[in-house]
Design a protein with these regions (language model features):
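A short alpha-helical cap/connector motif
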Residues: 1-153, 157-181, 186-260
Length: 260
């Protein structure tokens, strides 16, 4: 039944009218203004998914643009490949489309909500927890002449195990010298429903140990996979964003550089 439902949704998605970004001219050098224009919570405006809180609390977006621009500015005019994991309707993909004028963008999600199209955008249905879907993804990028990515951004489920599994799997598709980004990597510490593995060290601690080249015990990653990450990670930078909920800053972003 699930396969039939997916087949139906795929059919509907293919024939659904989409917004053609190739026909939209937006002149902006500011990634934050693009984030705000397309209303993604990566921007600074009050458009985050945390905005609609019952007590009327106003919550700003994450304000990640300043960090993205810091690390991505040298890639802005280059022909690069970008992979986004977890794109929903595609607001951030549309923003990156305008910011990276020559980039080819690959967007994956487990939902068929993506509403944009372009000659430079490739949407692919993929549930990253499904071995079958990951195999299809592997074949898909293989058919695209063995695509590897200059930038990979994980803004997916934010579930603890998924964050680590995505890092372990998709890091292999990152080019030498590329950047792997994890948005909201501390969410499992802030929201208990995202913490699906009991007694595991936090993502924050995982990143710290990877940065220090220290092997650690994990219920998710094998020692060989941890060694592989340590061997290939050059440096890690982490930052706090602007999203405050109930007096707590819940915005965290990590930039992981792969060795050349």
């Amino acid at each position: 039944m699930k396969s039939l439902t997916k087949l139906y949704k795929t059919f509907v998605y293919q024939y659904k009218k989409k917004i053609d970004l190739d026909k939209i001219a937006i002149k902006s050098s500011s990634l934050n203004s693009l984030f705000n224009y397309y209303e993604t919570d990566k921007g600074s405006k009050d458009v985050s998914p945390y905005s609609k809180i019952k007590n009327g609390e106003k919550v700003k977006g994450h304000g990640f643009a300043k960090f993205y621009e810091k690390y991505f500015k040298n890639l802005k005019k280059k022909r690069i490949n970008i992979l986004e994991i977890g794109v929903w309707e595609g607001a951030s993909t549309a923003s990156f489309y305008h910011y990276f004028e020559k980039a080819e963008l690959f967007a994956i999600d487990r939902n068929f909500k993506f509403k944009y199209c372009s000659k430079r955008i490739n949407f692919f249905f993929c549930d990253t927890t499904s071995v079958k879907d990951l195999s299809k993804f592997k074949n898909y990028v293989g058919l695209k002449k063995n695509i590897f990515f200059d930038i990979i951004i994980d803004d997916g489920s934010h579930i603890f195990s998924n964050i680590l599994k995505n890092l372990s799997y998709f890091f292999n598709y990152l080019k030498a010298g590329g950047i792997y980004v994890i948005e909201d990597y501390k969410h499992p510490s802030y929201f208990s429903y995202l913490q699906d593995i009991k007694g595991h060290i936090s993502i924050d601690k995982v990143l710290f140990l990877l940065k220090k080249n220290i092997i650690f015990k994990s219920k998710i990653l094998s020692r060989n996979k941890i060694r592989h990450l340590i061997k290939n990670i050059k440096k890690i930078f982490t930052h706090k964003g602007n999203c405050i909920k109930s007096g707590k800053n819940i915005s965290d972003i990590a930039f992981i550089y792969k060795k050349n």
